[in-house]
Amino acid sequence: MTQERSPSDGTPLIQPADIADIRREYTRGGLRRGDLPANPLDLFERWLKQACEAKLADPTAMSVATVDERGQPYQRIVLLKHYDEKGMVFYTNMGSRKAHHLENNPRISLLFPWHVLERQVMVLGRVEKLPALEVLKYFHSRPKDSQIGAWVSKQSSRISARGVLESKFLELKQKFQNGEVPLPSFWGGFRVVIDSVEFWQGGEHRLHDRFFYQRQEENWQIDRLAP
């Protein structure tokens, strides 16, 4: 380990000598073709259940990747709120950066990083906007403070200080204290229509198991990929 001294107070800053040395072996077990159901959602459901049972923090958290009009990728963590044969659902401010990206380019990638279980799942697809009634039903299932929070933030816009948000939140909390919080016109959701899913399971000696499901009309083609 090397030490550097802070120019302000002389406190040593300890940094890894070489982050390339940070590694570990993956030993929790492999994934074999005989383990695979015909439908990737069945395996996803099994793995998600196991992630919940393992008490992972935020097991439904997924990295959502979009690209802007210049082709610049962006990522952020969003919570999965529903999935079925139609696709995977998340909600957002429709004035946000990701919503603008998806308006121009509906292609999207999701990644579920279940590190403790030595697993990850990547989903590729395209989005479609959710119907208003579906959005309304979910919005009113949220805690009331979260509903108010949706009104407060003009997501991805520049603000001068956190106090701007806190003041607006208190103002709206007072306004809606005795009634229902209406659905903001700028708040909605997307369904990711799935084109392909890749399941990754860590393996010993970096011989990881990767299986790629590709939609083929009514069925799924399954291929093993080299690690």
UniProtKB/Swiss-Prot annotation:
Binds 1 FMN per subunit. Coiled coil: none annotated. The keyword Cell membrane does not apply. It comes from the Bacteria. GO terms for molecular function: FMN binding; pyridoxamine phosphate oxidase activity. Substrate binds at residues 23-26, 81, 138, 142, 146, 206-208. Keywords: Flavoprotein, FMN, Oxidoreductase, Pyridoxine biosynthesis. Its EC number is 1.4.3.5. Gene3D superfamilies: Electron Transport, Fmn-binding Protein, Chain A. Its cofactor is FMN. GO terms for biological process: pyridoxine biosynthetic process. Pathway: Cofactor metabolism; pyridoxal 5'-phosphate salvage; pyridoxal 5'-phosphate from pyridoxamine 5'-phosphate: step 1/1; Cofactor metabolism; pyridoxal 5'-phosphate salvage; pyridoxal 5'-phosphate from pyridoxine 5'-phosphate: step 1/1. It catalyses: pyridoxamine 5'-phosphate + O2 + H2O = pyridoxal 5'-phosphate + H2O2 + NH4(+); pyridoxine 5'-phosphate + O2 = pyridoxal 5'-phosphate + H2O2. PANTHER family: PYRIDOXINE-5'-PHOSPHATE OXIDASE, PYRIDOXINE-5-PHOSPHATE OXIDASE. Homodimer. Catalyzes the oxidation of either pyridoxine 5'-phosphate (PNP) or pyridoxamine 5'-phosphate (PMP) into pyridoxal 5'-phosphate (PLP). NCBIfam families: pdxH, PRK05679.1. This is Pyridoxine/pyridoxamine 5'-phosphate oxidase. It comes from Pectobacterium atrosepticum (strain SCRI 1043 / ATCC BAA-672). The lineage of its organism: Bacteria, Pseudomonadati, Pseudomonadota, Gammaproteobacteria, Enterobacterales.
